[in-house]
Amino acid sequence: MEAFTIHTGRAVPLRRSDVDTDQIIPSEWLKRIERTGFGAGLFSEWRADEGFVLNNPAYAEASILIAGPDFGTGSSREHAVWALQDYGFRAVISPRFADIFRGNALGNGLLPVQLPAETVETLQTAAEQDPSVEITVDLAAREVRGAGLVAPFELDDFTRWRLMEGLDDVGLTLRHEELITGFEATRPAWLPSAV
């Protein structure tokens, strides 16, 4: 997993609320288990509309999505996180996230940043008025900067540390590989092996 400390990039204003995981990545894209190749399926039904914000060339290099409230509702679908990442997003800013999506995002290195609705509105407006405006998501300082504001956000210390170290569940486990191997070496051969 790629480490996340501080990221500065352009932002896409997605003025939609209650965006569920089926809208993020429709089910026909879920036939694979690799984590790459899902960018083309991101919001694919909405992208059929020429006026959809991701079709605007001004947002082509955006790496931060600024969404409405209740982003990532619906089924638990890691593919939704993979699609956002494969498209190039490093962070999603919203007034509220579905708990399961938030957990999947944090577990895969996509930073979900929850900010007050008024702050999200300010950031969306800034990105609409000037698509080249840059937003900084600073995980070390736990704040978002841009559009003339500095907005703090909350994230527990352990999750913050994991993201800054680039550690998913497997990476965290592998930090103890020597201990695991040592433990396995002392177990009788007839017992199941963890390595």
From Swiss-Prot:
Gene3D superfamilies: Aconitase, domain 4. It comes from the Bacteria. GO terms for cellular component: 3-isopropylmalate dehydratase complex. It is an enzyme of class 4 (lyase). One of its GO terms (biological process) is L-leucine biosynthetic process. Its EC number is 4.2.1.33. Keywords: Amino-acid biosynthesis, Branched-chain amino acid biosynthesis, Leucine biosynthesis, Lyase. The keyword Glycoprotein does not apply. It catalyses: (2R,3S)-3-isopropylmalate = (2S)-2-isopropylmalate. The keyword Amino-acid biosynthesis applies. Pfam families: Aconitase_C. One of its GO terms (molecular function) is 3-isopropylmalate dehydratase activity. Pathway: Amino-acid biosynthesis; L-leucine biosynthesis; L-leucine from 3-methyl-2-oxobutanoate: step 2/4. Catalyzes the isomerization between 2-isopropylmalate and 3-isopropylmalate, via the formation of 2-isopropylmaleate. Heterodimer of LeuC and LeuD. Belongs to the LeuD family. LeuD type 1 subfamily. This is 3-isopropylmalate dehydratase small subunit. It comes from Frankia alni (strain DSM 45986 / CECT 9034 / ACN14a). The gene is leuD.
